Amino acid sequence: MRPELSQYKHLSAGKVREIYEIDDKHILMVASDRISAYDFILDTEIPDKGRVLTAMSQFFFDTIDFPNHLAGPADDPRIPEEVLGRAMVCKKLNMLPFECVVRGYLTGSGLVEYKQTSSVCGVELPEGLVESSQLPEPIFTPATKADIGDHDINVSFDVVEERLGEARANQLRDASIAIYKAAAEIARDRGVILADTKFEFGIDEDGTLVLGDEVLTPDSSRYWPLEGYEAGSVQPSFDKQFVRNWLTGPKSGWDKDSGLEPPALPGSVVEATRERYIEAYELISGQKFCQWIGSCV
């Protein structure tokens, strides 16, 4: 359900977030408890998910040395009380039309493409890689942004260059890989593998490239436990892969290619997903989720 914030104009709704206008230079980005999978927004919500996404984004925005769109603290007085802990005050940006995916390990759609072409988004990879193999170096595999219900489309770096120009495309790729490497080191030091992640960037009024949207959350990233990691099989995860696995497993009775809406998630899957999200935040940030604004009632 969308928060009714009478003091602000509602601008747009995404799969998970609601965007409100504060003034001509700032927006309020509110993370809901909605969860999406296979381009569907599920009917079932995950309690506290929006708070985890906001807390995780805040942690990495504060930690990673790169310009970002945050324009106030987590308890900024411009944040209405009813969404405190799940909202951020952000600068308005001219968002770039690409999802900036960085992969350090081979899994998901990247693995499917590799099996067909020995490459991912035009990046040639060595022979003999298997599910969950670590790549020799992280690779930049951009995708076009899709509307709700549509699929993001993986594209080559040449497409980004054609759209944005060589200089901006190189800046986007280099920034994405550098941020991934910094975050992967933080996660690994805490016993977590950052397998891949997705960034979104925009341009501010000064022409500066700025990191926007959410960053390095369990929604936008694949996080695996370092302990027990071994290439060749699907890894346990701290992200919404658990939901995807249930939906495509025998217990759901759902075919993702049927065109039908997914079923409601059972309580056990909801709670297990909530626990995984919270565990990811606590492991990586070193902070207790209960200490995050509005999380203990």
From Swiss-Prot:
GO terms for cellular component: cytoplasm. Keywords: ATP-binding, Ligase, Nucleotide-binding, Purine biosynthesis. Signal peptide: none annotated. Its EC number is 6.3.2.6. SUPFAM superfamilies: SAICAR synthase-like. One of its GO terms (biological process) is 'de novo' IMP biosynthetic process. It comes from the Bacteria. It catalyses: 5-amino-1-(5-phospho-D-ribosyl)imidazole-4-carboxylate + L-aspartate + ATP = (2S)-2-[5-amino-1-(5-phospho-beta-D-ribosyl)imidazole-4-carboxamido]succinate + ADP + phosphate + 2 H(+). InterPro entries: SAICAR_synt/ADE2_N, SAICAR_synth, SAICAR_synthetase_CS. Pathway: Purine metabolism; IMP biosynthesis via de novo pathway; 5-amino-1-(5-phospho-D-ribosyl)imidazole-4-carboxamide from 5-amino-1-(5-phospho-D-ribosyl)imidazole-4-carboxylate: step 1/2. Belongs to the SAICAR synthetase family. PANTHER family: PHOSPHORIBOSYLAMINOIMIDAZOLE-SUCCINOCARBOXAMIDE SYNTHASE. NCBIfam families: PRK13961.1 (NF010568), purC (TIGR00081). This is Phosphoribosylaminoimidazole-succinocarboxamide synthase. It comes from Corynebacterium glutamicum (strain ATCC 13032 / DSM 20300 / JCM 1318 / BCRC 11384 / CCUG 27702 / LMG 3730 / NBRC 12168 / NCIMB 10025 / NRRL B-2784 / 534). The gene is purC.
